[in-house]
Amino acid sequence: VIQNIDPRFFNVESLEKKTEEEKRKPFLYRYFKRLPEAGKFAFFDSGWMDETVQEKLSGDLTEKTYTDRIESVRRFERQLTDNGYLVMKFFLHISEKEQEKRMEVLEKKADTSWRISKRDVWQHKHYKKCQEAYLSFMKDTSLSSAPWYMIDAESRKWTELQVLEYLTQGIDIALSNQALAVPLLQNVFPMTQMPKLSEIPLDKELDDNTYKEELDR
């Protein structure tokens, strides 16, 4: 997705464990300080959804804390869009069978086996529970001004094409309409309808020629 973007104008942020400083700061602090300046992009590989859902699944969040996190995320994203940011969130969905297949491939190679963590193994074992947790978070945080896009990620090329198309559409809309979000009124956050994971087709594939034609288009 980023290979054709001028590297001077974007950053890729991959956040895992919090630093000691970040542990003493508000939940969204480490994301806020990595926001791009005007005219630039920031791609978050994982983000506030993954952090929140993982902590909920592990039992580290009470229901009240989880609810407070949801509210904080809504306000944070609304603050961003009210200040001219284009916020686009992608959930790359694969089936349980495909997940197992990819994990097996990684585990068989000495130079990639390290990528499979205990958390990955646990998530695969509890695939349905994890999917439900992520879907619940997305339903609660998919705003009209900062929607979630659920992507069929069974095929890498098809995934890249879908993400690029959504990004292009989002940027075009943002450029034609600078006011991305409606004013904040009495904590009302319009929600967008989220499709069920079971309704997302996972059989889309592209051959090399078709992929190149679609990408060039």
Place the predicted regions along the sequence by residue.
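Glycine-rich phosphate-binding loop of ATP-dependent small-molecule kinases
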Residues: 1-217
